[in-house]
UniProtKB/Swiss-Prot annotation:
LRR repeat spans: 97-124, 179-203, 204-230, 231-265, 266-291, 292-323, 324-342, 348-375, 376-400
A GO molecular function held by the record: ubiquitin-like ligase-substrate adaptor activity
Listed name of the protein: PRAME family member 17
Protein family membership: Belongs to the PRAME family.
GO biological process, one term: negative regulation of cell differentiation
UniProt organism field: Homo sapiens
Cellular component terms per the entry's GO annotation: Cul2-RING ubiquitin ligase complex; cytoplasm
Gene designation per UniProt: PRAMEF17
Cysteines joined through disulfide linkages: none
């Protein structure tokens, strides 16, 4: 007769209890906690829903990672677990063994089932398993904390699936006892009114990222104000109303409802991203005024900035401490860039990355920016591709970068003299001009990584090299 280890005997005993349906809450109270994960897995795979209901009531761990066990949501399993929780929540005096504080329906903690069950668990002594316990394994003292139910909420359909619908109804009737928590909320298809009702169910402090992409008016942002104002831990907000209009704000922030305006008061943002906002002229000034503290990053893409909009950039304190400024595909050939120069002057001590890409900046406009640019002593990356500048203008630009010793990556356009009628680079012309530009630059400082012309190279596909003297196609 072969000898079985104590842990193996416990496993067999648990399987026998499940098969013969002898499981009771009193028996569970006497079982060692090492047996629970494997028994729970067995009960789940065999669809023993009554056993699941009982095991939840005696669950000896802080967290039950049900989502990583189910993989695909299963309504009857979820119902059994929630019914077990109902029995617990209805008791004024909680059971001696109850430690469960989090029901996790996300697929994020598969290690739990690996550690506490199967070969790994059977190979560990009870002493070794007990060392896995941390301070969090022990119940907190004091008042009962609400049970937390964590989910992933990525709504790609216009209606809720049956599991989420059931869970939301269950949460609704247990307010104060249970918090529905979701770190990241995404809505791609659900109508605005239905989505607002769904947000009412989610514990607002748990939301760290909120992403809404739906075809509706930018002005409807105000309808989310009452919910956004409660999300004290929100760090990223992405709003895309319509196919082209996008507003992205990143950082820890607090919202103050203001239903009379399309934007909200943003107190602690770190990043503002605006892309293809067709009516930005009506909103940019107000948006910058709503930013109560300085931004770290400002990204503005695919739009037209009128003189009035450009003036806004230099007037508001929210842009006074930028580390990154990205203006991409902003048509500027008729725009007065003096306000942009004033902004660069203001952020000269903090700016590390400057992108002026595909803005069609002309020679006369570039000259306006040079005095301020030369003072950006912290600049590490300068991206200036896609602008219409001559060789002389580029030489002047390079001379003004002499004091920018931290520049590690520079990308410049091919001078106008190197372009044919279709705007394509003539590499034979570019090669000697590039040599002139490099000579001009080396007179004021030694560059690190630098590139002139389109990238990647249309002939060889190369990108900016780690070395200055990279291969240049002929």
């Amino acid at each position: 007769m072969s000898l079985q280890s104590p842990s193996r005997l416990l496993e067999l005993a648990g399987q026998s209890l499940l098969r013969n349906q002898f499981l009771t809450i009193f028996i569970l109270d006497e079982l060692p906690r090492e047996v629970f994960p494997l028994m729970f897995m067995e009960a789940s795979s065999m669809r023993h829903f009554e056993a699941l209901k009982l095991m939840v009531q005696a669950w000896p761990f802080l967290r039950l990672p049900l989502g990583s066990l189910m993989k695909t949501p299963h309504l009857e399993t979820l119902q059994a677990v929630l019914k077990g929780l109902d029995t617990l929540l209805a008791q004024k005096l909680r059971p001696r063994r109850w430690k469960l504080q989090v029901l996790d329906l996300r697929d994020v903690d598969g290690n739990f089932w690996t550690i506490w069950s199967g070969a790994r668990a059977l190979s560990c002594s009870p002493e070794a398993m007990s060392k896995r316990q941390t301070v969090e394994d022990y119940p907190r003292t004091g008042e009962h904390q609400p049970l937390k139910v964590f989910i992933d909420l990525c709504q790609k359909e216009s209606t809720l699936d049956e599991c989420l619908s059931y869970l939301c109804r269950w949460i609704h009737y247990r307010r104060g006892l249970v918090h529905l928590c979701c770190n990241k909320v995404q809505n791609y298809s659900m109508p605005t009114s239905s989505f607002r009702n769904l947000l009412k169910r989610v514990y607002p402090d748990s939301i760290q990222e909120l992403e809404i992409k739906r075809k509706c008016s930018l002005n409807k942002t105000g309808k989310f104000a009452p919910y956004l104002s409660q999300m004290s831990n929100l760090r990223k907000l992405f709003l895309a109303f319509g196919y082209d209009d996008e507003l992205y704000v990143s950082g820890q922030q607090q919202f103050v409802p203001d239903l009379d305006c399309p934007f909200l008061c943003l107190y602690y943002p770190q990043m503002l991203y605006i892309r293809k906002i067709s009516n930005i002229k009506e909103h940019l000034e107000h948006l910058l005024r709503c930013l109560k503290n300085p931004l770290g990053t400002f990204i503005f893409c695919h739009a037209y900035l009128a003189d009035q909009d450009m003036e806004c950039l230099s007037q508001y304190p929210s842009l006074s401490q930028l580390k990154e400024l990205h203006l991409i595909h902003i048509l500027m050939w008729t725009t007065n860039l003096e306000p942009l120069g004033a902004l660069l002057e203001k952020v000269a001590a903090t700016l590390e990355i400057l992108t002026l890409k595909d803005c069609q900046i002309q020679d006369s406009q570039l000259r306006v920016l040079l005095p301020a640019l030369s003072r950006c002593s912290q600049l590490t990356t300068f991206y200036f591709r896609g602008n219409e500048t001559s060789t002389n203008a580029l030489k002047d630009l390079l001379c003004h970068t002499g004091g920018l010793s931290k520049l590690g990556l520079e990308l410049y356009p091919a001078p106008l003299e190197c372009l044919d009628n279709r705007g394509h680079v003539n590499w034979e012309i570019l090669a000697p001009i590039r040599a002139e530009l490099m000579c001009t630059l080396r007179e004021v400082r030694q560059p690190k990584r630098i590139f002139f012309g389109p990238i990647p190279c249309p002939s060889c596909g190369s990108w900016p090299s780690e070395k200055v003297d990279f291969h240049l196609c002929s």
